[in-house]
Amino acid sequence: MLILALQHVLAMFGATILVPILVNEIAGCEVLTIPVALFTSGLGTLIYILCTKGKSPVYLGSSFAFISPIAYAYLAGGKSGVGLGIFAVGLIYVIVAILIKIFGHDWIHKLIPPVVIGPMIMVIGLGLAPTAISEIGINGGDLNLKYLIVAIVSFIVTAITATRAKGFLKIIPFLIGIVSGYVLSIILGLVDFTSIQKESYFSIPKFILPFKDYALSLKGILTIAPIALVTIAEHLGDHMALSTIIKKDLIKDPGLDKTLLGDGIATSVAGLLGGPANTTYGENTSVVGMTKVASVKVIGLAAIIAIIISFFGKIIGVLATIPSPVLGGISLLLYGFIAVNGLKVIVQNQIDFDDVKNVIVVSTMLVLGLGGAIISIITKNTNIQISGMSLAAIIGIILNLILSNTKKETNK
């Protein structure tokens, strides 16, 4: 079970640490730290497992949807603005969870039906594709042959293991692919061990203690909190995708109210401790899908490992030495798998594309989500930037509500 859990840790590690790195780059200073991001990721996952009574094999990691809002919230209201804004996001999740508990979840299904969820999941996966391409180094710049070789080997080893291996090896294809790519990277001289030397053996993450270090920042809250409406849709989409994979309706059992409650409390706790907002991780969902191991115990152990790692700088340093082409090769499979799950939602719900309304909703979401569309809402107090998946989700929901079906048959 330990090896299975390590596979999930490696799957989430790159994206989880990338969020604080990107936020800090945009803000021009340290807003978030990697150890706190790892700690709140693991703690948040355990909170989620507790709230869902151990019935949903979901891992929570740092959300990409909040990268720009967090950076702008920091510029508007400092770390207090960031922390309280993320706390407010979690609070919105909890409120929606309570409403679902009282009134049921039919209303949210009408608001966000499969015709919206399917392309939303596709945008999540395909929207991450440029990251994988960039990690490999085949995005139009000077080609590094060593990078390309490492990425190809990592990809092929993972794909062959997933499709041809037998027994225990078949359920750890990503771990085998990463190890193979890492060893080859060492042989080719692509691994830089200086990051390990710089890290201390043991250090306590730089937490921001609840209610002690905070000052009320309305600007920060208004910059971050509105994104919750988008990530709730992402939450629903991810759980529908996982339901398809494990052949169990997670929306009914443990229930959308419990999954949102777990995600919400986890996000609020992350905000109060100085971590990024949490979200259900498609990378780990892909691992579940390809390995066919949907064990909550494995996810829980991965969360505990993430918490432990956050206190040991040397371990973080070792994981940070994994070259980008290794992660890029693996990500080709991970992100593609996410996109295909979106397609499966459309197919399994028998979305009728003879109905022009459905064509308009899906096509508009795909173009906006993958076309680099960005809308900035700038006022005296806020600077909200909506782009990619977030923008596609909002427009998809609006179009689905205002357009009429052109055929008598409705989507299932």
How would you describe each model-predicted region?
Residues M1-L4, F193-I208, T244-I251, K258-T259, ...:
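Intrinsically disordered, low-complexity non-transmembrane regions of multi-pass membrane transporters
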Residues M1-V58, A65-G78:
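N-terminal signal-anchor module of multipass membrane proteins
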Residues I3-A15, L145-F155, I172-P173, L188, ...:
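Hydrophobic, membrane-embedded alpha-helices of multi-pass small-molecule transporters
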Residues T16-P20, S154-R164, I172, V183, ...:
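Juxtamembrane interface elements at the cytosolic ends of transmembrane helices
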Residues N24-I47, A225-V296:
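Membrane-embedded helical hairpins/re-entrant loop segments and their flanking transmembrane helices
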Residues V31-P35, G54-F66, I108-I117, K170-L175, ...:
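Short, non-helical or kinked segments that cap or interrupt transmembrane helices
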Residues P69-L75, A162, N284-I299, I305-S310:
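Interfacial segments of multi-pass membrane proteins
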Residues A76-D192, A303-K412:
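Membrane-embedded alpha-helical modules
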